[in-house]
Design a protein with these regions (language model features):
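A preference for well-ordered globular domain cores
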Residues: 1-117
C-alpha cells in the first residue's frame, strides 16, 4: 500500500494505492511525500495511519501532546537569545499556539496544528 501526502499542508492526497496507481499520481516534487512499508506510524495533521485497517484515524490526546512536545523540543533553539533569524517573533507565536492546543480544542477531531513559520 502506498500513500501520497502533501508535505506542506500535511493532507493525505491518496492512500491504498497499488504500485501502478501511485506511479501515475506521483508528481516529482519535494512537496509530496510517498510512504510505504512503514517503519513508524505516519501522522498527518491530527490523524495517524492505523496499519491494521490501512486507513487514517484520529490520534488520542496523549499522541497529540507527544507530537506537540516533539515539535517544541525540535524548535527550542529558535527561542534562544542568540537565534540569528529575523523571524523569532513568528516562531514564538507558533510555539505558543502549539502549547495552547489542549486548552483551545475540546475534541481531538477538531484540532488544527498551527503552520510553521
Amino acid at each position: 500500500m502506498f500513500t501520497i501526502i502533501d508535505n506542506k499542508y500535511k493532507n493525505v492526497l491518496y492512500t491504498g494505492l497499488s504500485l501502478e496507481e501511485r506511479t501515475s499520481k506521483l508528481v516529482p516534487s519535494n512537496r509530496f511525500v510517498l510512504t510505504e512499508n512503514y517503519a513508524t506510524t505516519p501522522q498527518v495533521g491530527n490523524m495517524k495511519l492505523d496499519k491494521t485497517i490501512h486507513d487514517f484515524i484520529y490520534m488520542t490526546w496523549k499522541e497529540v501532546k507527544r507530537n506537540r512536545d516533539d515539535i517544541l523540543a525540535k524548535t527550542d533553539w529558535k527561542d534562544l537569545p542568540g537565534y540569528p533569524g529575523d523571524d523569532q517573533e513568528e516562531w514564538r507565536t507558533y510555539r505558543q499556539e502549539l502549547r495552547d492546543l489542549p486548552q483551545d480544542y475540546a475534541e481531538v477531531e477538531d484540532i488544527v496544528f498551527p503552520t510553521e513559520p
